[in-house]
Amino acid sequence: DLKWRDALLVAHRVNSNNKRKERKTGMKDLTLSQQYALLALDGQESIHPSVAKSAVLRAVSAARVLETELGKADADSFSEFSAELQKAVQMAKTLKKKEETQIEKEVAAVLEAEELLKEVPDILGCDMNYDTSGVELKAYLSDEASYIRIKEGLRAEILEDGPISLEDAGLLWLLRESGCIHDLFSVSEQNRVEERMTEAAVQDEKYRALWEAEFHNVFEGFMNRFVKTKSKLLKNPYLEGVNLVFPYLDRRKSVFIDMVIFGTNVADRRAAAVEYLKKKGFAVEEIRVGSETLLKIGNIYYRIFPMTKTAYKVPIQGVNLVPAYWQ
């Protein structure tokens, strides 16, 4: 039994190392800001502004300042690194809306030209409140293979033993400051993330300065309101995995689909919802995770619940799709 466990552990480490190598090889032509944008823009509204997208674009502006410095040799002085880091933080904090718009156009154009990002119908357009409103809703969708390669490569780098490159620490920091870290790491993994970065900070003052730097307080008022409003939902299987040790933004929306399906069980309702979404042009997969079945739409996973809403005092039956945050 011990030999089997040891073999499994070795295989896991080899797989993790392969993921690191795949990411380094496959993403060598992408800058830090582009790798970050592929992860963070995925699923965000492309036409209309939002607080979550603003956080992403501010982080992109910071990444552009930092990416040259992070790619330099370790011999560079701490004072130079610290100066660039402070410049990056200030850039993110003071970015104007017009500058945000310009950054979005630039980064989207580059990634779209490489077929790594595209605009698709936003699933929010299937929600009862938007379906017949006439409002056009579009969202960014990252290339699945590239998205997974960057995501799993970073997860392997951070969660497994061994040195963390300064560039990967920078990518993790950008995800933390823009509220994206919950998309990549579960609650239990976030404890490991904190532990690993604390270790790195003790050993190298550059990592310490990076991990202590913050620009998310620009959104602090919004996040505090969100926490007060949503905390009660954590008693239900909605928005699971929110760890308030790290900044959190409401990046993904739940969707209520109006459909009356009498005399059916949960599986029937799920099948009807899948059929409806496919007719709307969405690529939907049913993914079995433990005892439940999730819907994978694009790069995002959803739980599905039967639900009744009231509009103009009339009860309306349907299903609610709720983003799944991993525990």
Identify the role of each PLM range.
Residues 140, 144, 149, 153-238:
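Short hydrophobic helical membrane-anchoring segments positioned at the boundary
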Residues 227-263, 270-272:
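An N-terminal amphipathic alpha-helical segment
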Residues 82, 296-327:
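Long, continuous compositionally biased terminal/linker segments
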Residues 1-29:
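Short, Lys/Arg-enriched N-terminal segments with co-localized hydrophobic residues
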Residues 64-89, 104, 118-159:
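Accessory beta->alpha helical hairpin/"wing" motif in late/C-terminal subdomains of nucleic-acid enzymes
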Residues 115-124, 281-291:
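Short, well-structured beta-strand/strand-turn elements
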Residues 110, 266-284:
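Amphipathic alpha-helical segments
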